[in-house]
């Protein structure tokens, strides 16, 4: 029995399984939204959930609890991984940072430029310039794992490293470009919560409950401040100690304990809540609008071109080297997979257009189509057109 449980847990934590689960949740959301349960689906997402303490009240639709709350946990895990890599991992050596950093930079600049070129002159549609800059790491990794043993493991490490910088880019974009009216009082409370975590860290205190309380206060204050609440997750991660006073791995333990919940609950639930595009509301004109074309070109063309071009230049001018055991063809195949924006692109789309249906959901459909095309083409290319090395 224990062996079965262990195998199930291993399966769930496998990146490929996580990607397959996201695909299932995406298809399920599309079926439910366009079937007889569509009304229940919308009621579920719009269900108000909250609490009040005295004059303070926090009452939000369930969809916002997912997008602002659960995704903060995902960004918290990204922050933990980033801190771990910089202090004790591959990023401790500056040479290992150059290639994924340049790749991520190209994967942000080129898609954004393509989107802007298509939508130039329209201030409202230009708000979505960051939509095609994101990559859904779980999906991309899942497809890479399915491509066969001739793909070296170094490319998986490259994709994971690229994803970290890609997520940092997304965090900065959200913080700088997608904030609303700011609240000074909320910022003061957030600052006090950060100060408390800094003191806990400097004193070497590793009581999880203390950090949890501070992180909740920080999350609520950031939510009320006008800055997107997911930033609370990444900030909290930076103050988590690497180890206890006894030398036990504290940060690693927290990171490992979150993997199951992120892979099995948070990301699938996010996909189910955000991928429900109502196909009956989409018209041909909306599909060929500047926003839809910009998203498709940015994700399917811009991502692979930008990531590969900047990677090639870094290698060509000897700022970086190819991942061990790989060749340029295989590297390009991985670059194609970065066009799978899916959950992260849907997330930024919701911030850019404030979950509006002004484009008749054609923007969401463009994200799904571009992600699907990137995934299929990336798989075919890596599986059948790359040479063994």
Curated annotation (Swiss-Prot):
Transmembrane segments: 12-32, 62-82, 97-117, 128-148, 157-177, 184-204, 220-240, 260-280, 282-302, 331-351, 365-385
BP GO terms, sorted: regulation of pH
Topological type in the membrane: Multi-pass membrane protein
Chief location: membrane
Top-level division of the source organism's lineage: Bacteria
One family name in Pfam for this protein: Na_H_antiport_1
Assigned keywords, A-Z: Antiport, Cell inner membrane, Cell membrane, Ion transport, Membrane, Sodium, Sodium transport, Transmembrane, Transmembrane helix, Transport
One Gene Ontology CC term in the entry: plasma membrane
Subcellular localization(s) per the UniProt record: Cell inner membrane
Gene Ontology MF annotations: sodium:proton antiporter activity
Reaction catalyzed: Na(+)(in) + 2 H(+)(out) = Na(+)(out) + 2 H(+)(in)
Family indicated by similarity: Belongs to the NhaA Na(+)/H(+) (TC 2.A.33) antiporter family.
NCBIfam families: NhaA (TIGR00773), PRK09560.1 (NF007111), PRK09561.1 (NF007112)
Function, in words: Na(+)/H(+) antiporter that extrudes sodium in exchange for external protons.
HAMAP family per the UniProt record, alphabetical: NhaA (MF_01844)
Protein name, UniProt field: Na(+)/H(+) antiporter NhaA 1
